[in-house]
Amino acid sequence: MEESTPDFSLIVSNNDQAAAQALARGDFVQAYLLVHALIEALLRLFLSIPDGKDISFNDLIHKYRAYLEEEHYPIPTFIDELTQFNQRRNRLVRQLWRKGFSFTNRQTEDAARMAVMMYGLFIEWLETFDPEITRMGFRYDDGD
């Protein structure tokens, strides 16, 4: 039996909606982790990394840096932000087992809100290289 390919735009839309709902109801850990998954998916798609390929977020950042260098882009835009974003995710996961969900969730509000903002800015930035990126389900708030 042949496995069908999932509609990636529906998955992205579902995760995007779940992140927004988590943020609205104060589930900041969940919102942060969902945004992390969305940014990972965005990088994988943008860099044409096959879905089944096992690659770390850190390696995705390195591949993104290489892409910018290939494009002769002089400024490593979003490299530091993505690195700090991933490091914060790792700290957040460690905090869950060290200090528990309630404490970690309270401490994650600002980070979750910034993650959502960075996600939108990153989509807008990548769209300058690939205008089709939003057709894949990734969207940002353009104020409309």
Segments predicted by a language model, with ranges:
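Sequence-level detector for tyrosine residue identity
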Residues: 32, 64-67, 73, 119, ...
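A short, mixed-charge helix-start or loop-turn motif at secondary-structure junctions
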Residues: 1-2, 71
